[in-house]
Regions:
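Short glycine-rich anion-binding loops that position phosphate/pyrophosphate groups of nucleotides
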Residues: 70, 128, 153
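Short, charged beta-turn/beta-strand-edge "cap" motif at the junction between a beta-strand
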Residues: 127-128, 240
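A glycine-rich beta-to-alpha transition motif near the start of alpha/beta enzyme domains, typified by
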Residues: 1-117, 156-265
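Internal active-site segments that recognize and position negatively charged phosphoryl groups
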Residues: 136-164
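Short, solvent-exposed secondary-structure boundary/capping segments
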Residues: 117-125
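Glycine-rich, charged/polar anion/phosphate-binding loops
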Residues: 132-133, 141-144, 172-174, 184
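Short, charged/polar, Gly/Pro-enriched secondary-structure boundary elements
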Residues: 129-133, 260
């Protein structure tokens, strides 16, 4: 007699510059995706991840992906998560391009290289939207940042040195009334004419080692501010990505398949 649970959820775990995701077929779950995402992402009692990309069939794209953060909130898009989805697709079929539907529209990922389980993609992230600069004033935190939308909201703060306690500041900024849906917060230090270093507080996740859309937003804000020129090397704790702004914003970086398994429900 089997002692295993009757129901399991198959998953693939992938990482893009230390930003890790679980890739799961949406049809594997009949219940609440938000609650199941929280359970799956729990690093002590679940599999552990920054988010879950739930996959569904799509008439126009190779696949449709709905992204849920570790706290169960649904997000429009993750550049790193989209590359992780593309890596799963790339492991299943020979194709130089993958078209993925996200909450921020259709995104094309072009395969530029592969080394074992690591896939290198350039993703067309579309046009940035720049609402302008905004000053945030609150007890203990004062910051002037550039607002950038890459299909999801970002607030980019330029610093010479990353401040002590930036994680707490990022959390306070991310939940300000000025951002009704919350925002992602990036602290950016310019280290060369084509290079920046970033720290990231992601809405619905917290501190992360990397962010694809955060890298794009940071590079765009730096280019607009004439601090750097395209293409921009973006250095994060989890790795390096390259952002090119040529009409659309293009994001180049790796995605690595980590493992496959089953989650007992």
């Amino acid at each position: 007699m089997s002692i295993l649970p009757a129901r399991t959820i198959p998953f693939t775990k992938a990482s893009a510059c230390g930003n890790d995701f679980l890739i799961v077929e949406g049809g594997a779950v009949s219940g609440d995706l938000a609650e199941m995402s929280r359970r799956l992402c729990d690093r002590h009692n679940g599999v552990g991840a920054d988010g879950v990309e739930w996959l569904f069939p799509d008439d126009e794209a190779d696949i449709a992906a709905r992204l849920f953060n570790a706290d169960g909130s649904e997000a429009e898009i993750s550049g790193n998560g989209t590359r992780c989805v593309a890596a799963v697709l790339g492991s299943q079929k020979e194709s130089a391009e993958m078209l993925i539907r996200t909450g921020a529209g259709l995104k094309t990922c072009r395969l530029t290289g592969r080394r074992g389980a690591t896939f290198e993609f350039e993703a067309d992230m579309g046009d940035p939207i720049l609402p302008g600069e905004l000053a945030i004033e609150m007890p203990g935190v004062g910051a002037v940042g550039t607002q950038v939308s890459m299909g999801n909201p970002h607030f980019v703060v330029f610093v010479d040195v990353f401040p002590d306690g930036w994680q707490r500041q990022g959390m306070l900024i991310a939940t300000q009334p000025a951002f009704p849906q919350g925002t992602n917060v990036e602290y950016v230090s310019v280290i060369g004419p084509k290079e920046i270093e970033i720290r990231l507080f992601e809405r619905g996740v917290g501190e992360t080692r990397s962010s694809g859309t955060g890298s794009c937003a940071s590079a765009v804000a730096a280019i607009v501010g004439r601090r750097v020129s395209s293409p921009v090397k973006v250095v994060a704790p989890g790795g390096v990505q390259t952002v090119r702004w040529d009409g659309h914003v293009y994001l180049q970086g790796p995605a690595t398949l980590i493992c496959r398994g089953e989650f007992f429900v």
